[in-house]
Swiss-Prot record:
Organism taxonomic ancestry: Viruses, Duplodnaviria, Heunggongvirae, Uroviricota, Caudoviricetes
Protein's cellular compartments: Virion
Entry's transmembrane regions: none
Family: Belongs to the P2-like viruses major capsid protein family.
Propeptide residues according to the Swiss-Prot or TrEMBL record: 1-31
Cross-referenced InterPro entries: Phage_P2_GpN
Keywords: Capsid protein, Virion
Name under which the protein is recorded: Major capsid protein
Species whose genome carries this gene: Serratia phage KSP20
GO CC entries: viral capsid
Length: 348
């Protein structure tokens, strides 16, 4: 670490101590991040990613409790102007699971001395450190949200490179708590580069599968929700649309313009806005509003240690947060779990 980096880093440590109302020495030990600072860190993490900025990130007081947003059993409006028959308010909360449980997840982060030396010549040295940690925390949460299937202690990153054992994510919650909202193992008609059918599948195309899933799995009052979107992997969208794009390129003079319109982010699948999410399973499709997905973190539950590790030529930040990944209303969910393109029998 260069001398100028040393001076800036010491200032960073002093600032962290000041913000969290602890001594500089305590920063290198274990300390609880001040709830106000934690909220700012969460906001920075959410703003650092376009997907997280669209869903909810809620701070909750209790580690275990009821969801912040309770699903609806349906419409409540009615008419009763009688003077003899009383109006009867009904409980409109869903019967599907509505509890959450925040569990400890480690988001440890190391920054090399070399990287710090490079940042030392930037005017925003301290924000660069904070932003790097916030960004990685965001990516890890998205990865767990879409791939997490268990909570193992200890977790094994080598065996679970997508953090499958660091928590139960959105998709696994749907599988376990609302299996009636899931269609599994379907096929889509496969086509060649000229858009000619190779093998017929359960559905003619991805849009047809999405349309059927929405209309057969969602509660009636959610099917036409204007906030519904399609969330999938870029691989599936590209594979699905390539034959159509290629066919247009051979028959339409406005090739580049039309092809560009097909692959822009605003492209609609199943007549709904489509969002390509990082780390989303390549064989899955989720239909739901963004605001039906939430990450809960426990206020006051963020623990942190920032210390130098010269034996590894780095500064290490050891931090843990109590988190949960929540689907607020299962009635506004349709999940296709296992979608592939039909293959010819006997591989021929």
């Amino acid at each position: 670490m260069e001398n100028i980096t040393r001076e800036l880093f010491d200032q960073y440590i002093s600032r962290q101590a000041q913000l969290n109302r602890v001594s500089p020495a305590a920063v290198a030990a274990k300390f609880a991040v001040d709830p106000t600072v934690q909220q700012k860190l969460e906001a920075a993490a959410q703003e650092s990613d376009s997907f997280l900025s669209k869903i909810n990130v809620f701070g909750v007081t209790q580690q275990i409790g009821q969801k912040v947003l309770i699903g609806s059993k349906g419409p409540l409006a009615g008419v009763n102007n009688s003077t003899t028959t009383r109006r009867n308010p009904a409980d409109n909360s869903k019967m599907e699971p509505y509890d959450y449980m925040c569990r400890k997840v480690n988001y440890d982060y190391g920054i090399s001395y070399e990287q710090l030396d490079a940042w030392a010549h930037q005017p925003n040295f301290q924000p660069l450190i904070s932003s790097a940690m916030a960004r990685q925390m965001s990516l890890d949460r998205i990865m767990i949200g879409f791939n997490g299937t268990s909570y193992a202690d200890p977790s094994n990153r080598a065996a679970n490179p997508l953090l499958q054992d660091c928590g139960i994510g959105f998709l696994e919650k749907i599988r376990k708590e609302a299996p009636h909202r899931v269609i599994s193992n379907i096929t889509v008609t496969s086509r060649d580069e000229d858009n000619k059918i190779i093998t017929k599948g359960t559905y003619g195309n991805v849009s047809a599968a999405v349309y059927d899933a929405k209309n057969s799995l969602m509660d009636e009052w959610h099917k036409r929700n204007p906030d519904n979107v399609v969330i999938l992997a870029g691989d599936l969208l590209t594979t699905s649309n390539f034959p159509a794009i290629n066919a247009m390129s051979q028959t339409n003079p406005n090739t580049e313009m039309l092809a560009g319109q097909l692959i822009v982010a605003q492209e609609r699948v199943g007549n709904m806005p489509t969002f390509i999410a990082p780390f989303f399973p390549v064989n899955g499709i989720l239909i739901t509003p963004f605001k039906n997905l939430s990450i809960y973190y426990q206020r006051g539950g963020l623990r942190r240690t920032i210390k130098e590790e010269p034996e590894y030529n780095r500064v290490a930040t050891y931090q843990s947060s109590n988190d949960d990944f929540v689907v607020e209303d299962y009635g506004n969910v349709a999940f296709i779990d296992g979608i592939t393109f039909a293959q010819p029998e006997n591989g021929g």
